[in-house]
Each structure stands twice: as structure tokens, then as C-alpha cells.
Amino acid sequence: MKDLTVIVPIQNYDTETQTLLKRAIDSYKKADDGKTKLLFIGPKEVIEKVKEEYKGKNTSYIENENTNFQTQINIAVEKCGEYFSILEYDDVYTPKWFENVEKYMETNNEASIYLPLTQVLLYEGMENGPIGYVNEAVWATSFSNDLGYLDLEVLTSYMNFNTTGGVFRTDDFKKVGKLKESMKLTFWYEFLMRTLFNGKKIFVIPKVGYIHTLNRKGSLSYIYNETLSNEEADFWIETAKKEYMFKNDRNKTFEA
């Protein structure tokens, strides 16, 4: 896809990561039409190893010692073209995802974010295939005010949306304030609400474009689902609802 950069944030390069990353990059190659760029960001010692394995004229690297996901993305977008997408190393694209985005953009070019229908896998039992979908709710009759679009009213009461794999307009991502580092666990939820609050549009393309892995130990979903109490989870949700009206990260240290 022209003017699209795929960001791959990575924190380590152990045997498990190498196996999962190869799977992720293979999916990128199948989806790529030769125009998409690939950008790895991670600590210096990790990037040095990645460089040995993944090379090419459309591949670049950023060495950054801060392994905070939000920081990595915020730094990487400064090196992106008109659009960017995020590929987590334990996830995969479907082969026609970028092609489908381009087709929908031909008739619907007003959205700031194009999300895919996302299949969900459990890390333990990946071989069993998807257990369900996310992002599909906006295509249900009467769910949102405009079929296929996410709206703020719905998002404040329903938060089961996955953003990785989506295609973002880089300038709009910057204009609404990027990701907030202080939002430790619900940063994507807060970002989606902030995007809509600032008058931008989020559209879900009714095509499966991404397969997302849940509950890999150490992942955000694992932390959220397996280690947080109900009170802590509620705290982060409510904090997101209070912070989305502020464009800039207010640099608070939130504690549940």
C-alpha cells in the first residue's frame, strides 16, 4: 500500500519472540504489494539482531531503550509516511488486508482510522484457531448512529475494540495527541475516545484483516485479564473516561 509504514515494536529477541516474529513478518510479506515500508523499533541490542534477520530496501530501524509501548509508537510515527499500521510480533495480517483498505478508501476517504474485523486467538491453543471476533459490533443494526462507524456514545459504554492492525492517518494521530504514556493499561481505549472527541472518524472495514493473540504471558491482555482485580480494571477504565477530553498527557502517575 502506497505511503504506508508498518511499525513493529519489539522489546526482546528470545527464542519464543523469534518464532512469533517470523510468523508476523511472513504475514506482512503476503499482504505487501511492494510499496509498504517496514519499521522496527526497540532497544539497541534487539535491533542489532533484527537487522541480521530482516533486511530490505523498504526496511528501517529505530534504536530506542524505552520499551514502553506507547513511547515506541509515538517515536516511530515521526518516521512514517501518510499512513501507518502497527503489527505486534505475536499477531498476523491477513493476505488482502492492505488491498481491502485501499479499495474502501476509494469511496470512503474521510476516516482517520480504518480498523479491520479482527479474529482473536488464545496464545495457549493457537493451533485451535480463532475463538471469536472483535470490532464487528459497529455493523450490527442500531449499535451505532452510523453503520460501520465507531461513535463516542457507544464507546463510553462498550470498549471491546482492537486497534492494532488498523491503518491510521499519521497527521491525525499526531494532531489528537498520540498515545498517552500515563495511561498504563487502557491507553488505546482512551485514544479512541479522544480521537472521536476531536471530531475524527473511525471506520471498521467489514473484512477480516488481522489476527490478534490474547493472553501471552507478559502481554497487555495477560496483565489485564489475569493479574488485575476488578477494582483495578474499573479504575483504569474510569481514568480513560476522565482523560480523553485532554489532548495532551497530563503527566500524572496514576495508581489504582
Regions from the PLM with identified roles:
Residues E82-V92:
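Short beta-strand-to-loop acidic/aromatic patch adjacent to the donor-nucleotide binding site
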Residues V208, H212-L214, S221-K252:
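Catalytic core of nucleotide-sugar-dependent glycosyltransferases
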Residues N64-C80:
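Glycine-rich, basic loop-to-helix element that forms the pyrophosphate-binding segment
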Residues K96-V134:
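Conserved donor NDP-sugar-binding/catalytic core segment of glycosyltransferases
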Residues R23-K35:
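Short, acidic, metal-binding catalytic loop of nucleotide-sugar glycosyltransferases
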Residues L117, V134-Y158:
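Short, flexible, basic/aromatic active-site loop/helix in glycosyltransferases
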Residues K184-F191:
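Acidic donor-binding loop at a coil-to-helix junction in glycosyltransferase catalytic cores
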Residues L117, F203-G209:
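Catalytic beta-strand/loop signature of glycosyltransferases that borders the donor
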